[in-house]
Swiss-Prot record:
The lineage of its organism: Bacteria, Pseudomonadati, Pseudomonadota, Alphaproteobacteria, Rickettsiales. One of its GO terms (cellular component) is cytoplasm. One of its GO terms (molecular function) is GTP binding. Residues 439-442 are annotated as: G4. This is Translation initiation factor IF-2.
């Protein structure tokens, strides 16, 4: 039966007639219900409350007694009871309280069975018995007493199984709190009290294990916790004995590798690697590094194969080949070069129709600028403006290397100058085509032919003279012949067939870099191949980082940059050097490895070229008698190119007696750390287009550190040159002022020998230097002890007068000796 089917209990009365069940009980259904309960269902007795008993006459009770009770016999009851026991055994409950529940249920049924016999005999009793009421009360009380013995420690389950008692209409249920229906009669109802439930007992670890194991094995044997532990340990030993076979790998070993990294590469334990090292006589821990040869021996001893790589192989990821079908036409990159104030920036100003030159101090370009100009027909030209001052030779050289065409601007009224010649040499060394733009043709009294003749001297021959160089007279101010200049650029670009691969990872060159407060490191780059996008990770020299923002030459933020497009990017961890190559890499770890490798190379190179001091120099420096003086400097600038140009120009200043030592150079404002370094080393801080913050100024006043600001580079160089000149020892020069002839020697007691002399030329001064000559040979050089005219001590004696002379610490004088008098004059030296 199911839980949803409700069975109306029949009224139970006592009489002389035989008891019988009016509803048959299916033993198969009851057994199936208990089997479905499985091992996790429990037995509980459920009974429903009844109303109060009514009193009826004995004759009515006998007539209403159900005939089915009489037909029930003891064999049927026992058979069904055995079914209950079998179901309880199949439930595999290990809780003793549950077993006692079943036993008590059986005892209840036996007590009910014992009541069957008197009921059968009562059928023959006379219907007019007067003690019927008392008998019914006794039987009911006994039933209630038996019901109270039924335990309630039965946990709830979702699966319910019902069994109806064949005698008293009771319903037994697994999985839900127990309730029993007893003794419903037509005249009276006996209420059975509800059974008190106790808290369900918690299953222990062993109980759960036994339930699971019994389900699998089918046996009801209870296992102890100790046996469970032994079984688990046995399984563990079995797993250890079945260890997987060792895998031998191909291990990539660089020039230097850590012990822990080597163990990870081989998938070996660090302890095993350390043991192998100890066999080789090397004591090392997991954090120490070993060389490639030792690592190879360890890996070979452990059965692995080795692949040796060089440290420089980290840069192999930067090498890529472009397919011919991927190449696309790109815009030409044009570098404008020339002497100072010849109109390079004004030319770009005219081409861009913007006022670039107005914002430059002294009319001098201080750093490289990159611009992109779009012509009327839609074609574009990228211009790179380089400084013309001699200090920016390195920047001009870099500009020539990254360009396709060089425009050399020459002023028609000034002709060829020093930086013009240098620009020509840079262009020739780079092997790029040259266009000469003769600027300022709008000025009066100019001679273009004179400029062309000067170009011939430097092997720049125009097309009209049979050469291959295009010479175009222009006026940047009046915008004369600018269209011809643009046509010449596009013609040469078309002849060169300039192409680049816009697909794949981007690569290019750093044009300029700087640090800006609030924005961090800003780097101007020129994309030469591929497409640079936001969030790309790039490596430039020893700097690396993720591209956070890209801004074009018009100040607009863009998402990608194609070949020949100059952009300013933000996101590098430090300022790269102008001219460094940049590449896009896959991840930040790859970029970091390349940067660390390049930093090691730079450090080794710096150590190798450092000047070595001799032991004598060290002793002289320690004693303070060193002939070489030092001028320590700290240079801070707005852009990396300017700082590099300043450092290079200052180091070229010629001086054998003064060593210019640049302690630190960098991009950005002057900080307190710069002040601390300057104070510790007595250095001068040079700021080019940067200033010191409020805290740095306070520290400078307190520590009395010299800070000098400049905005034009040649003012800075002249000032440092003057400082170095002031540190040089002055030149001491002798100046002849007079001479005298010794005519007579006097010996005076307590004074010594006195030379009576006659001043023959010039003037004789007491504090001047003196030489004594005999036969035109200097026999003494010193000072006067006394100089008298008659008896008076005088400071000087002029030509034509007589005087008395005595020498300091020298008396070997004779008549006829000559006295020469001179002064020592100091002159300031210049670099």
């Amino acid at each position: 039966m199911t839980d949803n089917q409700e069975i109306k209990p029949k009224k139970l009365t006592l009489g002389n007639s035989k008891l019988s069940l009016n509803k048959s009980f299916d033993s198969l259904t009851g057994a199936q219900s208990f089997v479905n309960a499985n091992s996790k269902t429990l037995v509980e007795v459920r009974k429903s409350s009844t109303g109060s008993a009514t009193t009826l006459s004995l004759n009515k009770e006998r007539n209403s007694l159900d005939q089915t009770v009489i037909d029930a016999n003891k064999e049927e009851f026992n058979r069904r009871l055995s079914i209950l026991k079998k179901a309880a055994e199949q439930s595999k409950l290990n809780d003793p309280s549950k077993i006692s529940t079943l036993s008590k249920l059986a005892s209840i049924n036996q007590s009910a069975n014992s009541r069957i016999e008197p009921l059968e005999t009562d059928k023959e009793v006379e219907p007019k018995q007067q003690n019927t009421e008392e008998n019914k009360v006794e039987v009911s009380a006994k039933i209630v007493q038996d019901d109270e013995d039924i335990p309630s420690q039965i946990p709830k389950k979702k699966e319910d199984i019902f069994v109806k008692s064949p005698l008293v209409g009771m319903r037994t249920r697994y999985g839900i709190e127990s309730e029993k229906e007893l003794d419903k009669t037509a005249d009276r109802k006996i209420v059975a009290p509800k059974i008190k439930l106790e808290e369900p007992k918690k299953f222990k670890k062993a109980d759960l294990f036994n339930m699971l194991s019994d389900d699998e094995s089918g046996s009801g044997r209870t296992r102890s916790l100790a046996s469970i532990k032994r079984a688990r340990e046995k399984e563990k030993r079995k797993l250890v004995s079945q260890a997987p076979e060792k895998v031998y790998r191909e291990v990539t070993i660089p020039e230097v590798i850590g012990v822990g990294d080597l163990a990870n590469a081989m998938s070996e334990r660090v302890a095993d690697v350390i043991k192998e090292l100890m066999k080789l006589g090397i004591l090392a821990n997991a954090s120490q590094t070993i060389d490639a040869d030792t690592a190879e021996l360890v890996a070979t001893n452990l059965g692995h194969t080795v692949k040796r790589v060089q440290e420089s192989d980290v840069e192999n990821v930067l090498i890529s080949d472009d397919k011919v079908e991927d190449l696309r036409t790109r815009a030409p990159v044009v570098t404008v070069m020339g002497h100072v104030d010849h109109g390079k920036t004004s030319l770009l100003d005219a081409l861009k129709s913007t006022d670039i030159a107005a914002g430059e101090l002294g009319g001098i370009t201080q750093h490289i600028g990159a611009y992109r100009v779009t012509l009327a027909d839609g074609r574009a030209i990228t211009f790179i403006d380089t400084p013309g001052h001699e200090a920016f030779s390195e920047m001009r050289s870099r500009g020539a290397k990254v360009t396709d065409i060089v425009i050399i601007v020459v002023a028609a009224d000034d002709g060829i100058k020093t930086q013009t010649v240098e620009a020509i040499n840079h262009a020739k060394a780079a092997g790029v085509p040259i266009i000469v733009a003769i600027n300022k043709i709008d000025k009066p009294d100019i001679d273009i032919e004179r400029v062309k003749n000067e170009l011939y001297v430097h092997e720049i021959i125009g097309e009209e003279a049979g050469g291959d160089v295009m010479v175009i007279p222009i006026s940047a101010l009046k915008k004369i012949n600018l269209d011809k200049l643009e046509e010449a650029i596009l013609l040469i670009a078309e002849m060169q067939d300039l192409k680049a691969n816009p697909f794949g990872a981007a690569a290019g060159v750093v044009i300029e870099s700087k640090i800006e407060q609030g924005r961090g490191t800003l780097t101007t780059i020129l994309v030469q191949r591929g497409t640079l996008r936001n969030s790309d990770i790039i490596i430039a020299g020893t700097s690396y980082g993720k591209v956070k923002k890209m801004i074009n030459d018009k100040g607009l933020e863009i998402l990608e940059a194609t070949p020949s497009v100059p952009v300013e990017i933000q996101g590098l961890n430090e300022v790269p050097f102008a001219g460094d190559k940049f590449n896009v890499v896959q991840n930040e770890k790859q970029a970091k490895d390349i940067a660390e490798y390049r930093m090691r190379l730079a450090k080794e190179k710096k150590i190798s070229i450092a000047p070595r001091s001799s032991l004598e120099d060290l002793f002289l420096k320690a004693s303070g008698n060193s002939k070489i003086k030092e001028l320590p400097l700290i240079i801070k600038g707005d852009v990396q190119g300017s700082v590099e140009a300043i450092s290079g120009s200052l180091l070229k200043l010629p001086s054998d007696e003064i060593k210019l030592r640049i302690l630190h150079s960098g991009v950005g404002p002057i900080t307190e750390s710069d002040l601390s370094l300057a104070h510790a080393s007595s250095a001068i801080i040079v700021g080019f287009n940067v200033r010191a913050g409020a805290n740095a100024l306070t520290a400078a006043e307190k520590e009395k550190v010299d800070i000098r600001y400049y905005s034009i580079i040649y003012h800075l160089i002249d000032d440092i040159k003057a400082i170095m000149s002031g540190m040089l020892d002055p030149i001491v020069r002798e100046q002849y002022i007079g001479s005298a002839e010794i005519r007579q020697i006097f010996n005076i007691i307590k004074v010594g020998k006195i030379a009576g002399s006659y001043v023959t030329k010039g003037i004789i001064k007491k504090r001047a230097g003196v030489r004594l000559l005999r036969d035109n040979v200097v026999i003494h050089e010193g000072k006067f002890k006394t100089l008298k005219r008659f008896k008076d001590e005088v400071k000087e004696v002029r030509e034509g007068y007589e005087c008395g002379i005595a020498f300091e610490n020298y008396e070997d004088i004779r008549e006829g000796d000559t006295v020469e008098v001179f002064e020592l004059i100091q002159e300031q030296r210049q670099l």
